């Protein structure tokens, strides 16, 4: 299948329907019948593919830009038979390759980025190219095309280890590693373009997003993908430290609703937290998944807690999370086969993969 600079042709539906489970609760931000033209960078990735799906559901024409370095074409297979989606395999940092795709676009959802901690320590140039240069390229393309709104996927990692919980948007930025730094620098560019060039922008700081289609690549990363692959393999969960650390896990459809609400609002030049506002311990996650555990050393540079103050987004957009952790875990278990071919981590392979983490962040 030729995909570069061509209409994306969906080939088959996914074996598990991840579109309906849990998405009945994303009413805010999804208004069927809107006739917008939207563009999603990173639209074949985890969060991006869910945004694409929601945009099509409400009646948009959608352009997807993704270089497939971490995204998967299979994440868009469920859109079988839809001719309202155009897919282009391009590097967002290549301005000349992407600029024409922004013509006539109303809303841009800039989700594309290189993620994960360890690879960013090992490959800082690559992360700057994707997350900073790529963001500037997207901003310039949006500005040149006269795009009406741009929503940027910022990261809660900008807070580092905060002084206060719940953590408000006014907390100081203390990025602990190159990924966090590049996402924060990208956010500052977005807000700067909004101020200088009058481009209507909103930055949403995502907290610990999870849900169907979360990444299954070989990089050691988010806890849900690791645990689900271990559960499928009948292996113990590798719990960092004593498991008492808490995370503000936020279900992906709640994140999608926040993105669409921000895009459809008149709010501009603002950064807002997007989170459940209900931190859950890793031990509680293990309890919900069921299974044995093995403990591995606690890592430097990781907060004991992530816990967002969501007062601002609730006040400005009326957004509130809908999916509880219990509901979210049940949805993941119903779709667990998605992680069938994901790598199965053990204490030894994790120690090897995180060697640079301890070396540079200790």
Enumerate the predicted regions with their spans:
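Glycine-rich Rossmann NAD(P)(H)-binding loop
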Residues: 41, 209-213, 239-250, 272-280, ...
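Hydrophobic "lid"/C-terminal helical patch
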Residues: 51, 259-263, 286-289, 329-336
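Residue-level signal for the nucleotide or nucleotide-sugar donor/cofactor binding architecture
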Residues: 71, 93, 122, 130-133, ...
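Conserved C-terminal active-site "lid" loop/helix of NAD(P)H-dependent oxidoreductases
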Residues: 252, 283-284, 299-321, 327-331, ...
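Mid/C-terminal beta-alpha module of Rossmann-like enzyme folds, strongest
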Residues: 265-300, 309-310
């Amino acid at each position: 299948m030729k995909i570069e600079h061509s209409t994306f042709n969906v080939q088959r539906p996914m074996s598990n329907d991840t579109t309906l489970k849990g998405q009945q609760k994303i009413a805010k931000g999804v208004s069927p019948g809107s006739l917008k033209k939207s563009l999603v960078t990173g639209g074949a990735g985890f969060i991006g593919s869910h945004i694409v799906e929601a945009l099509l559901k409400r009646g948009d024409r959608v352009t997807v830009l993704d270089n497939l370095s971490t995204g998967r074409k299979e994440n868009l297979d469920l859109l079988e038979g839809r001719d309202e989606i155009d897919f282009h395999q391009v590097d967002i940092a290549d301005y000349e390759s992407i600029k024409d795709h922004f013509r006539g676009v109303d809303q841009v959802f800039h989700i594309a980025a290189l993620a994960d901690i360890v690879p960013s320590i090992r490959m800082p140039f690559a992360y700057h190219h994707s997350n900073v240069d790529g963001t500037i390229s997207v901003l310039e393309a949006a500005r040149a095309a006269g795009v009406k709104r741009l929503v940027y996927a910022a990261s809660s990692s900008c807070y580092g280890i905060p002084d206060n919980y719940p953590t408000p948007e006014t907390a100081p930025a203390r990025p602990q590693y190159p990924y966090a730094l590049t996402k924060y620098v990208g956010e500052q560019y977005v807000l700067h373009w909004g101020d200088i060039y009058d481009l209507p922008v909103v930055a949403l700081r995502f907290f610990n997003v999870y849900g169907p289609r979360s990444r299954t690549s070989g990089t050691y990363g988010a806890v849900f993908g690791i645990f689900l692959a271990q559960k499928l393999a009948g292996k113990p969960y590798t719990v960092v430290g004593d498991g008492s650390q808490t995370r503000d896990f936020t279900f992906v459809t709640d994140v999608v609703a926040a993105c669409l609400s921000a895009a459809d609002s008149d709010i501009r030049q603002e950064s807002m937290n997007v989170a459940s506002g209900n931190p859950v311990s890793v031990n509680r996650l293990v309890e919900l998944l069921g299974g044995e555990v093995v403990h591995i050393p606690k890592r430097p540079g990781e907060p004991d807690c992530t816990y967002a103050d969501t007062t601002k987004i609730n006040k400005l957009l009326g957004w509130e999370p809908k999916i509880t952790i219990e509901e979210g875990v049940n949805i993941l278990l119903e779709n667990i086969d998605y992680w069938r071919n994901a790598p199965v981590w053990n204490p030894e392979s994790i120690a090897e993969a995180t060697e640079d983490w301890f070396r540079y962040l200790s």
